[in-house]
A protein has these predicted regions:
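Active-site microenvironments that recognize anionic phosphate/pyrophosphate groups
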Residues: 1-233, 237-240, 314-316, 330-334, ...
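Helical scaffold of the NTase/Pol beta-like nucleotidyltransferase catalytic core
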Residues: 204-206, 236-263
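Beta-rich nucleic-acid/ligand-interaction surfaces
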Residues: 270-278, 355-361
Length: 521
């Protein structure tokens, strides 16, 4: 490998895509050389330069050329350790030398926004892929399919984009000096941060400053996008998640500024919340989720808000949909939230408080659709008991082989994010089933084999149940569709578990009782 040709190709790519001005080419080249510990460079023949330009023009995103540069650094002993973590830190460092400063990117963003809001986000999204902040190569590894259900098509993904931690990195973390900078992975101080073995490098992160309802916020994309233009909007202040009147103001203020995007929030309580409760933030993007496509199954009316169109959504979880004037939506959403926070229905296992701890909250999802503001509110409760120690309205234990983690807002909206282990585990199950079918042996032999396999034993009862419920005899050609259906049915059941008002006569009547309680408050 000629490292100089690789660097020149990367810089040429950056110039072609307006990441680097021609006048800054030498400056940026030297910065990249410094980042990989290289103190020399060379000139290129006309033929080489032509080949470099042609190669750069053929690149959509610079993942491969960056990987080759990082590979060179690893072979030259330039990394603390040759692990994915340290390779990623160098990868971000190199692109951080190439990207313009935030002020330049933000000025370009808002300049385009004045002419075309959609183009502004399109350009910024593209920049995040060109900078390798969005890891397009890793995201492409994810497995995804649609699953038909009685609520509409659900979206299923097996997440393979996040690399496994190397044991050497895990061991090195114990030697890291504790630091409170940045306070978390969402703080604004991450922008340009060099990272460390236990904190991702963010030299190639750029965030756009925003004003939401008079407060300072920032807009960025997720490095591991789960759907189209998956963005994160986070508070300038490191403060805990909080679902309240201001939260509804913020999400609707955002969709007023970016009507082609939705914005949603994880819950602000453990178990029903997301993985980061310590920093106030939202997730949005340009994707029509299954929940958005779901119809309203029962129209309702709220006292004093007769101008707001409202209804119960035909969805496995308990969701209200509100449509109308932005400010009126904010006030009604807050009224519903306050009613829900104090609401109990012991016959359905819903307790607002136990031992002075409150359990009720909501997931809001804001949109601007067909000329109107729209706000979905998914009702959540995080109570536990001895039967369900991980959560009463949480995936039940018999589903934990597929999904045991918290159900966050992305999954509430109908997109399953399932662990990468399922790829190999399901492949092993399909192999056992195929062998049994070919040999004409009963599937009981497969269940017995699985029960003796540490990785597969958790799936044995689950598989037996889904085979017994499958409408047609299993064939070797139908194993893929069978497994996809079994996983999809399981995810649908997971969402139903999380619903506070079940799809039973008692549950539906309980939902109506809650709506009456809102109207009587």
């Amino acid at each position: 490998m000629d490292i100089y040709i690789e660097i020149e190709t990367l810089i040429t790519y950056a110039v072609l895509h307006n990441l680097v001005k021609k006048e800054d080419r030498i400056l940026v080249t030297n910065a990249v050389l410094e980042s990989i510990g290289c103190d020399s460079y060379r000139e290129f023949t006309a033929e080489e330069q032509a080949q470099i330009t042609a190669a750069a023009q053929a690149i959509t995103y610079p993942t491969e050329v960056l990987d080759r540069i990082v590979e060179w650094a690893a072979t030259q002993g330039k990394l603390t350790a040759d692990t994915i973590t340290y390779r990623d830190l160098l990868n971000a460092k190199i692109m951080g030398q190439i990207l313009p400063r935030t002020s330049v990117i933000a000025a370009s963003f808002w300049g385009t926004y004045q002419k075309d809001k959609v183009q502004a986000t399109n350009d910024f999204y593209e920049l995040n892929k060109q900078s390798n902040y969005i890891r397009t190569d890793r995201i492409a590894k994810n497995i995804l399919w649609e699953h038909p259900s009685k609520y509409g098509n659900l979206e299923i993904t097996i997440n393979l984009s996040k690399p496994e931690k190397d044991p050497r990195d895990i061991a090195a973390q114990k030697d890291v000096v504790a630091t409170n900078y940045p306070k978390c992975l969402l703080c604004k101080e991450n922008e340009g941060y060099m990272g460390r073995v236990n904190h991702a490098g963010r030299q190639n992160l750029r965030a756009i400053p925003l004003n939401l309802a008079g407060e300072d916020w920032y807009f960025q994309y997720s490095p591991y996008i789960y759907y189209n233009e998956h963005c994160i909007v986070f508070s300038s202040e490191h403060r805990p998640m909080k679902i309240d009147h201001a939260c509804f103001e913020h999400v609707l203020s955002f969709v007023a500024q970016f009507p082609h995007y939705f914005l949603s929030s994880n819950a602000d309580l453990p178990i029903v919340g997301g993985s980061i409760l310590s920093h106030d933030h939202f997730q949005g993007g340009k994707h029509e989720f299954p929940m958005e496509k779901a119809t309203v199954k029962e129209k309702v009316q709220f006292k004093g808000f007769e101008d707001i169109e409202a209804g119960v959504v035909n969805w496995p979880m308990s969701v209200l949909r509100l449509r109308g004037d932005k400010d009126r939506l904010i006030d009604l959403a807050d009224h519903i939230l306050q009613s829900w926070i104090g609401y109990s229905d012991e016959s359905l296992g819903i307790y607002a408080y136990t031992q002075g701890v409150h359990h009720n909250t909501v997931n809001p999802v804001a949109r601007f659709k067909n000329g109107q503001y729209e706000l979905d509110l998914a009702l959540r409760n995080n109570r536990t008991d001895s039967t369900h120690p991980m959560g009463i309205f949480h995936p039940y234990e018999h589903l934990h082989n597929i999904k045991k983690e918290n159900i966050g807002i992305i999954e509430v909206m109908g997109l399953a994010i399932l662990p990468g282990r399922l790829k190999t585990e399901m492949a092993s199950i399909k192999k056992l089933l195929a062998e049994a079918i070919a040999a004409g042996k009963p599937f009981e032999n497969v269940y017995a084999q699985m029960s003796n396999d540490e990785a597969l034993q958790k799936h044995a009862k689950w598989l037996e149940q889904h085979i017994s419920n499958y409408p047609t005899p299993l064939t070797s050609n139908g194993l893929d569709s069978f497994i996809d259906k079994a996983i999809g049915d399981t995810f649908c059941e997971v969402l139903e578990n999380c619903g506070v008002f079940k799809h039973t006569p008692e549950g539906e009547e309980g939902f109506r009782k809650f709506i009456k309680a809102v109207n009587n408050l």
